[in-house]
Amino acid sequence: MSTSDGVPSTGGRSPEELASQVRLLEDEVSDLRRRLTESPGGSRGLELRLADAQRSLAGVTSQNERLAQTLREARDQIMKLKEEVDRLAQPPAGFGTFLARNDDDSIDVFTGGRKLRVNVSPSVDLDTLQRGQEVMLNEALNVVAALEFEEVGEVVMFKELLADGDRALVIANADEERVVRLAEPLRGDTIRAGDSLLLDSRAGYVYEKVPKSEVEELVLEEVPDIAYESIGGLAGQIEQIRDAVELPYLHPELFKEHQLKPPKGVLLYGPPGCGKTLIAKAVANSLAKKVAAKTGQEGKSYFLNIKGPELLNKYVGETERHIRLVFQRAREKASGGTPVIVFFDEMDSLFRTRGSGVSSDVENTIVPQLLSEIDGVEALENVLVIGASNREDMIDPAILRPGRLDVKIKIERPDAESARDIFSKYLTTTLPLHADDLSEFGGDRDACVGGMIRATVERMYTETEENRFLEVTYANGDKEVLYFKDFNSGAMIQNIVDRAKKMAIKDFLDHDQHGLRVSHLLQACVDEFKENEDLPNTTNPDDWARISGKKGERIVFIRTLITGKQGTEPGRSIDTVANTGQYL
């Protein structure tokens, strides 16, 4: 405040008061300045103490967390140990087989040789339980869990299904017949007579079909991928079998119009190694392709390769049962119009003339079984029986009569023309040929291969001194010289080519001579002939000759005319025996 003339007013206070007030203010300012000066140092100390406190807190917190984690782990370990103790202290659980469900939601089970009615835990869904299913029982014999079906047991043979459809008659060991229940997996499934089933003999349930390897191996083999074009030297025989097999399937309306029934069977007979089995396999393959071409759908046929010795069984009736099973499966597959070929290899070993057995008369029941299958009460539609044998004279005549094996085709040993055809299947222009042999034909691979084949066939089929093999003496005293060409076969030709290829490989490795030569083939012929020197070594020349395809007058004596493999061993004679009627 000021006066009117501009002089400051003192507010009625004296100068001493004002001076005192000024001093107080100055002291306050000084104190503030001092405190301001000291303030940064104090703040720093507080910050340090605060940081120390925070570090201590963090350490205590971490220690507390570790302690809490240790306590939790200890608690979990204690709980696990307690559970283990409780588990080990529990009484053992039992197992049973579910039989039926009752109206009060209890169930009947079979356990420990007893049939019991027990209660079920709420955790088990009654609607999912199936007949024959395994269940778990607690100490109070209450069901606490549902398990799978039994997987082990006794193998029995199915005979027939009973009228109620829930039970079956089976044959156990020692031909014991039993009535058993069908478990749920078998209900509604197709079960055929002769099928093997898995039986739980305690509960009386059969659970599943068990494939029997000795039967399954013989049944339903897919068609081999062998075409007629792969077979050489048998054009006439192939034409015969195509007429007998393919025409009825490709033109059934013509057969029906002419009231002609297709043949039921074909017999392929002839010496070993001449292509009987090969033709049978090609029949199935060709038939499938022809059916596919006619219908426009994927062609399929089945080739059941039945090896005679595999069917034989020491137990009475087992061989006949296997034959029935084979034809039963064949009928099932053929019922849909699919052609099925049942091929009996080495037919003479299984269906020998009845009464010709020396140690047993097993053929007395096996032969009638086959006859009843071929033309019995059940029709054999779309099923063709093909038999192969090199001793057709030993097959029972009832099998060979018309109406059973209608078509009989002889697979002869190849002549020179057929041998050239067979060689052409194995000697092709894709093989590596020696440069010297190629140069003789101006580099023409086709001409070179043709020349090799001609030279090899000429070496095999000429009636020269070095090609003489045997001198046979007949029962009437006549003698005849047989050459190697009389014992040639497609298998021998293949073996000769394989020998020549091996020689070519060895020449390349030893002498760096690359490619097949005609000299390899000629040397392979010599080695093959020498190796066959020991083949007629038998105590029964007549039977050996029949197997080899030499029919006619009975042979009583054989003498080899070739030298040994080293070229120094003289020819030798082979004695005969008095009884020449027994088959070796």
UniProtKB/Swiss-Prot annotation:
<dbReference type="InterPro" id="IPR003593">
    <property type="entry name" value="AAA+_ATPase"/>
</dbReference>
<dbReference type="GO" id="GO:0019941">
    <property type="term" value="P:modification-dependent protein catabolic process"/>
</dbReference>
<keyword id="KW-0067">ATP-binding</keyword>
<keyword id="KW-0647">Proteasome</keyword>
<keyword id="KW-0143">Chaperone</keyword>
<feature type="region of interest" description="Docks into pockets in the proteasome alpha-ring">
    <location>
        <begin position="583"/>
        <end position="584"/>
    </location>
</feature>
<feature type="coiled-coil region">
    <location>
        <begin position="16"/>
        <end position="91"/>
    </location>
</feature>
<keyword id="KW-0175">Coiled coil</keyword>
<dbReference type="InterPro" id="IPR027417">
    <property type="entry name" value="P-loop_NTPase"/>
</dbReference>
<dbReference type="InterPro" id="IPR032501">
    <property type="entry name" value="Prot_ATP_ID_OB_2nd"/>
</dbReference>
<protein>
    <recommendedName>
        <fullName>Proteasome-associated ATPase</fullName>
    </recommendedName>
</protein>
<dbReference type="Pfam" id="PF00004">
    <property type="entry name" value="AAA"/>
</dbReference>
<dbReference type="GO" id="GO:0005524">
    <property type="term" value="F:ATP binding"/>
</dbReference>
<feature type="binding site">
    <location>
        <begin position="273"/>
        <end position="278"/>
    </location>
    <ligand>
        <name>ATP</name>
    </ligand>
</feature>
<dbReference type="InterPro" id="IPR050168">
    <property type="entry name" value="AAA_ATPase_domain"/>
</dbReference>
<dbReference type="GO" id="GO:0016887">
    <property type="term" value="F:ATP hydrolysis activity"/>
</dbReference>
<dbReference type="GO" id="GO:0000502">
    <property type="term" value="C:proteasome complex"/>
</dbReference>
<comment type="function">
    <text>ATPase which is responsible for recognizing, binding, unfolding and translocation of pupylated proteins into the bacterial 20S proteasome core particle. May be essential for opening the gate of the 20S proteasome via an interaction with its C-terminus, thereby allowing substrate entry and access to the site of proteolysis. Thus, the C-termini of the proteasomal ATPase may function like a 'key in a lock' to induce gate opening and therefore regulate proteolysis.</text>
</comment>
<dbReference type="Pfam" id="PF16450">
    <property type="entry name" value="Prot_ATP_ID_OB_C"/>
</dbReference>
<comment type="subunit">
    <text>Homohexamer. Assembles into a hexameric ring structure that caps the 20S proteasome core. Strongly interacts with the prokaryotic ubiquitin-like protein Pup through a hydrophobic interface; the interacting region of ARC lies in its N-terminal coiled-coil domain. There is one Pup binding site per ARC hexamer ring. Upon ATP-binding, the C-terminus of ARC interacts with the alpha-rings of the proteasome core, possibly by binding to the intersubunit pockets.</text>
</comment>
<dbReference type="InterPro" id="IPR003959">
    <property type="entry name" value="ATPase_AAA_core"/>
</dbReference>
<dbReference type="InterPro" id="IPR022482">
    <property type="entry name" value="Proteasome_ATPase"/>
</dbReference>
<dbReference type="GO" id="GO:0010498">
    <property type="term" value="P:proteasomal protein catabolic process"/>
</dbReference>
<dbReference type="Pfam" id="PF17758">
    <property type="entry name" value="Prot_ATP_ID_OB_N"/>
</dbReference>
<keyword id="KW-0547">Nucleotide-binding</keyword>
<dbReference type="InterPro" id="IPR003960">
    <property type="entry name" value="ATPase_AAA_CS"/>
</dbReference>
<dbReference type="InterPro" id="IPR041626">
    <property type="entry name" value="Prot_ATP_ID_OB_N"/>
</dbReference>
<dbReference type="InterPro" id="IPR012340">
    <property type="entry name" value="NA-bd_OB-fold"/>
</dbReference>
<comment type="pathway">
    <text>Protein degradation; proteasomal Pup-dependent pathway.</text>
</comment>
<comment type="similarity">
    <text>Belongs to the AAA ATPase family.</text>
</comment>
